[in-house]
Amino acid sequence: MIPEDDTTLSSLRPGDVRPELLAPAGDMDCARAAVANGADAIYFGLDRFNARLRANNFTLDSLPELMRFLHAHGVKGYVTMNTLIFTSELPDALAYLGYLNAAGADGVIVQDMGLARCLTEWSRRDPAMKLELHASTQMTLTSPEGLEFASRFLDLKQAVLARELSLKEIEQCARHTDIPLEVFVHGALCVAYSGQCLTSESLGQRSANRGECAQACRMPYA
């Protein structure tokens, strides 16, 4: 985290919002390291509906312990459900949301518009549903118009902009929406737009939008 006396923070103007530092974590060691080094929140996947199924992930059983640890240190935890959901999977996905809410997760980062709409409606009719809805970078929100369209139907508490945007494009989005925006400042870029790549599916029948990206764009070709 940037020290409080850092000139970047001291130059914030009245009314400016201090950025939230969000870090990924795949296990408790990573979570502890993120907390120890000043993260305001962490994001992580579980064993389903997660774009990084082949990475180290937490389990449903470990989630309550993780959330207790995070909240004891004033840190939030957001669960990634950043894949496309098949219609046949929707009941399981909704049950997942219920479990995440009961376990104390602060929010979910969602790609699928249908699932996002379901969570919006659930939150509106049931005050006990406390999960915040965050739009994933996989939702491909690239413009003020896209943000405006999404906000008509979804109660977004935060939107992760597509990773491919320039600083000028990010600024334009920020000027035209009241939705808090999140951007990646470190990490890999997709060869295509976030959430729109079909290369892995076309070449190896492993969909990047289902957590199975084979990273075909990084393979050597003769």
Residue ranges, per PLM feature:
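Conserved nucleotide-cofactor-binding alpha/beta core module
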Residues: S143-G146
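Active-site pocket-lining/capping segments in soluble small-molecule metabolic enzymes
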Residues: I2-L141, L161-L165, E169-A222
